[in-house]
Amino acid sequence: MPTIKDVMVAKPTARQIADCSKWPIWTCGVSKFEWEYTQTEKCLILEGKVTVHDPGYPNQSVSFGAGDFVQFPDGLKCVWNVIEPVKKHYDFE
């Protein structure tokens, strides 16, 4: 089973930015919620700040924000803590 350590955060390439611009947009206000990925998700964070952690281990976390390209693996269970309202392009594989 994937863990938070399997979440990849990087600065996007020019190609990734161009590809992401065709993807749908998702927005979320400041909140905290549990999420389970049933597919791999790739996203480009346009606005906001988020910390995601394993449900039982809040000290094992990853943070990302505007300008980051993030990939979440299929099967990951996590808790999203949206610190600043988030807007992202996203795609599921």
Regions inferred by a protein language model and the residue ranges of each:
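Conserved short histidine dyad/triad with adjacent acidic residue
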Residues: A10-K11, D19-T38, F64-A66, Q71-D74
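Short alpha-helix capping/helix-loop boundary micro-motifs
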Residues: E36-T38, P55-N59
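Transition segment at domain starts
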Residues: M1-A18
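Short, conserved beta-strand element in jelly-roll/cupin
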Residues: T38-V52
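Short, surface-exposed secondary-structure edge patches
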Residues: K42, Q60-S61
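Short hydrophobic/aromatic-rich beta-strand segments that constitute the beta-sheet cores
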Residues: W35, V52, K88-Y90
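Ligand-binding loop in jelly-roll beta-barrel domains
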Residues: D74-E93
